[in-house]
């Protein structure tokens, strides 16, 4: 078992007018990552804001991510941010993990649109693992789960703000470790009861009920 790097990208929308010159609907504004060793321990984290060249940091994205223009105006461009990311990665090749396939496709598409070489990326990062698909397989239900729902369902609660790239990467790493190491995947009992057959699709318990008795994972350091 080799090393894993769990990657989470935060993005902002690109207006239709700007897409005439930049053929992507979104643009990366933060790269977050968590590095896992061979024992699936989280040994390091990475976060870098990225200054968008075409995207617009609108109020919705600001509210969702907590990212403001002050964080981005002096941030590196994507090329420089990726150079920092590659310098942070270990020298040996790692397997990339992301909550869904969106991160890989966005990164590849944006690098292509900005004429950035994929050579260095391909040398350092091997295959990609779709953690959302792994989780859906364990749940045996074909639908798209949000990361936040998957964490609650899996009895994982970590400190930090959702939709922050580093926090989401860290939380995805916790879930990925559980998916790989638990032969019989254990759910939060309140979540499991709320979703047992016959109860329908409406959640029968409050969020407070779901959080009772959670095994708290070590949080991110301040």
Task: Place the predicted regions along the sequence by residue.
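Conserved non-catalytic scaffold segment of RNase H-like nuclease domains
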Residues: 2-109, 160
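Active-site flanking residues adjacent to catalytic metal/cofactor-binding acidic residues
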Residues: 7, 129, 167
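Short, glycine/acidic-enriched loop or turn micro-motifs at the edges of active sites
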Residues: 11-13, 133, 171
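Substrate-recognition/cap helix-loop segment adjacent to the acidic, metal-dependent catalytic center
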Residues: 102-127
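Active-site catalytic microenvironments for nucleophilic, acid-base chemistry
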Residues: 110-114, 137, 153, 178-182
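Acidic two-metal-ion nuclease catalytic site recognized across multiple nuclease folds
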Residues: 174-222
């Amino acid at each position: 078992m080799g090393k894993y790097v769990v990657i989470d990208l935060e993005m902002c929308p690109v207006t239709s007018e700007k897409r005439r010159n930049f053929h992507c609907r979104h643009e990366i504004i933060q790269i977050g990552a968590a590095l896992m060793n061979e024992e699936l321990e989280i040994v390091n984290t990475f976060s870098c804001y990225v200054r968008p060249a075409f995207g617009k940091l609108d109020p919705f994205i600001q509210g969702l991510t907590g990212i403001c223009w002050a964080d981005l105006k002096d941030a590196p461009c994507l090329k420089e941010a990726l150079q920092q990311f590659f310098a942070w990665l270990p020298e040996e090749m790692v397997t990339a993990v992301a909550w869904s396939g969106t991160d890989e496709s966005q990164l590849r598409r944006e690098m292509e649109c900005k004429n950035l070489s994929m050579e260095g990326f391909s040398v350092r990062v091997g295959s990609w693992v779709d953690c959302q698909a792994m989780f859906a397989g364990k749940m045996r239900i074909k639908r798209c789960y949000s990361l936040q729902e998957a964490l609650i369902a899996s009895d994982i609660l970590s400190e930090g703000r959702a939709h922050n790239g580093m926090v989401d990467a860290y939380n995805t790493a916790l879930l990925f470790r559980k998916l790989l190491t638990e032969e019989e995947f254990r759910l939060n009992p309140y979540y499991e009861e709320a979703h047992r057959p016959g109860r329908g699709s409406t959640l029968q318990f409050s969020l407070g009920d779901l959080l009772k008795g959670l095994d708290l994972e070590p949080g991110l350091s301040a």
